[in-house]
Amino acid sequence: MGKIIGIDLGTTNSCVAIMDGTQARVLENAEGDRTTPSIIAYTQDGETLVGQPAKRQAVTNPQNTLFAIKRLIGRRFQDEEVQRDVSIMPYKIIGADNGDAWLDVKGQKMAPPQISAEVLKKMKKTAEDYLGEPVTEAVITVPAYFNDAQRQATKDAGRIAGLEVKRIINEPTAAALAYGLDKEVGNRTIAVYDLGGGTFDISIIEIDEVDGEKTFEVLATNGDTHLGGEDFDTRLINYLVDEFKKDQGIDLRNDPLAMQRLKEAAEKAKIELSSAQQTDVNLPYITADATGPKHMNIKVTRAKLESLVEDLVNRSIEPLKVALQDAGLSVSDINDVILVGGQTRMPMVQKKVAEFFGKEPRKDVNPDEAVAIGAAVQGGVLTGDVKDVLLLDVTPLSLGIETMGGVMTPLITKNTTIPTKHSQVFSTAEDNQSAVTIHVLQGERKRASDNKSLGQFNLDGINPAPRGMPQIEVTFDIDADGILHVSAKDKNSGKEQKITIKASSGLNEEEIQKMVRDAEANAESDRKFEELVQTRNQGDHLLHSTRKQVEEAGDKLPVDDKTAIESALNALETALKGEDKAAIEAKMQELAQVSQKLMEIAQQQHAQQQAGSADASANNAKDDDVVDAEFEEVKDKK
């Protein structure tokens, strides 16, 4: 049996690993790098470039250089998150005939799995070059909170790349495998906080060790499939564009070449600010007008970056609370916190996570490589090369059937460990009913139509009887591959019908495509509801923080500003009681606009506090780095 390679197909970077004996090894690509940018470029002469070569030519070919495709995979074009990307991406995102988000590359319509397959092909080639033999099988990781459509699209990408995807596993689970495999960890409960380029996950995982065998059991998972480093970059890019417009009167958003240079510079500045207190974004000849060439030279401090992205970091905290609650644990039950994903290198992210869990995250896990290593370990488990490891993952959403009155009745609740099997007895709704329809659903909503439809089948031949008399046993069985088998049996006549719903493979192409479309169509309103809840949470946070700042500002806030802010707060509070997401966002925007003076006062107060703190510690501190950081930040504020 050949090697099963492990691939972390990331939004920003991808990584491939294999099992080399009992150890996982991350492989270097043709350019000598252990990670590969998830960037694909289609050149004018018909060449397809992947990784660093694609990144290098992006400035001169922005419309045909594709990045962050994982944010589009398995998504509908009308999704709000996709529409946001439409407005900021230099390439063209279009709606496919089936309503999915596709891309227009040099006039050709391309599906996200088709494009992601190019990255997977490079990962496959990297492994083949190292092993000196063909590679046909892989374990590919996905965010824990990816839905069926996104998982299936990822699997399709693997198939297009010439890989049989033996298992799709969740990124935090893979990171836990990488963390726990070679350590004498004993029995521990860990939290894996995974903030990557485009997605965020939190998983609570229990590692048990009995007689040398390690069991990795996922207790709960949560997340946000449209929150990541790309969003942080966008905030910084928008700030730089606005500053340049104020200074030069030119809006760079209309210049794709300038925006591509700015994207690279913003990403570089963000990375630098993880270790430095300030950096310069220096882009000579960024654009030109009638008066001649224009240059950008803007200082950005760590404090400024943090102020731009604080709400994004805070957005990751709510899923932590939900995951802990679902696991039935408190923060004191967590032994270790593991950070995964490049964006977790940001000091503010590390600080917020440490504050939430009351302990410092571990530093001995490589955030860029852990997921690929875990995928390789799972590949080793499947081939039998890795022994004494048992991985128990969970189903992220509840599974059930539609019952009388259009109600969703769950048979398997979310965060149930797989494999699992559950049966329940139902009956007929009408006298002498001879058949029942079993409609299989996925989701957390009470109304059946608000959940995702996974398929349906009929059970015929029920003997005539008064309503409520026949006994129909419905059984849900999920195996270790995440494949759902549903059966319905009339206990009186013995008649039975079955359906297999697979999140991986086995159905023919036409059936797979139909199920994906059906599931997406039925999940549309649920996505909108989730977005509304998310916006409400953001609105609540803004309401609370602004009121707190008004209170702290006291008499320093002019009466006119205070009146305007109070009015905007009341308007936002009213909007939060409604169901209109756009109205809530509009009121949040209005509040932000009238709160400028308040922000200035808050920043001044913060600077004064920092100055006092720096003066007090300057005489005593032994750690030069800390003193420098405090001193620099105060200087920037002044």
Swiss-Prot record:
Keyword Phosphoprotein: yes
TM ranges: none
Keyword Phosphoprotein: yes
Stretches with biased composition (Low complexity): 603-620
Ranges for region Disordered: 603-638
GO function term, MF aspect, one: ATP binding
UniProt keyword list: ATP-binding, Chaperone, Nucleotide-binding, Phosphoprotein, Stress response
Induction, per UniProt: By stress conditions e.g. heat shock.
PTM sites of type Phosphothreonine: 199
Protein role: Acts as a chaperone.
NCBIfam families in alphabetical order: PRK00290.1, PRK05183.1, prok_dnaK
Stated family: Belongs to the heat shock protein 70 family.
Protein name: Chaperone protein DnaK
The organism of origin for this protein: Salmonella enteritidis PT4 (strain P125109)
